């Protein structure tokens, strides 16, 4: 499952969902739908943000997988609860970072080809220790952007990594 934080209308509160094909399933609306149409309230306790779901991930993830199994497999975008669709096209939303305000952000130096090229550009050979020791640095947790967001950068910038 690929989890997302999104909004359908700019300026509204972020919502917690996940991708299924080309649609985003809204977890809260889906839980209400299952409760009202199938009498199953267990999914109403799923947290309404990925940040909160991560606090008890084992329990949350099991419920999220079961929620998905409980939903119709076809025409998911035609189902609604209280006039709100339980699924919307992924093209019709604004994405936030999946965890909108992480407490910390570690950027791992983990892609071999990237590391090799960066070292070669500095006249260095690949260090064999890199294969045994994960290397990371702390980065700015407020500098995260959602899918398709415009990332601000200084005017003379010609390329982004």
Model-derived features: positions:
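Non-heme Fe(II) oxygenase catalytic core, chiefly the N-lobe of the double-stranded beta-helix
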Residues: 131, 139-161
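N-terminal non-catalytic cap/leader segment that marks the start of a structured domain
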Residues: 1-135
């Amino acid at each position: 499952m690929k989890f997302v934080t999104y909004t359908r209308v700019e300026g509204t509160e972020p919502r917690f969902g996940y991708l299924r094909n080309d649609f985003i399933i809204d977890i809260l609306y889906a839980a209400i739908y299952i409760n009202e149409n199938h009498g199953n309230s267990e999914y109403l306790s799923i947290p309404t943000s990925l940040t909160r779901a991560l606090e008890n991930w084992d329990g949350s993830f099991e419920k999220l997988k079961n929620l998905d199994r409980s939903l119709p497999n076809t025409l998911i975008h035609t189902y609604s609860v209280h006039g709100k669709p339980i699924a919307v096209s992924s093209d019709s939303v604004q994405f936030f970072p999946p965890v909108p305000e992480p407490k910390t952000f570690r950027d791992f130096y983990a892609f071999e080809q990237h590391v090799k090229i960066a070292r070669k550009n500095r006249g260095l050979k690949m260090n064999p220790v890199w294969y045994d020791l994960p290397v990371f640095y702390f980065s700015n947790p407020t500098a995260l952007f959602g899918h398709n967001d415009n990332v601000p950068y200084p005017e003379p910038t010609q390329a982004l990594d």
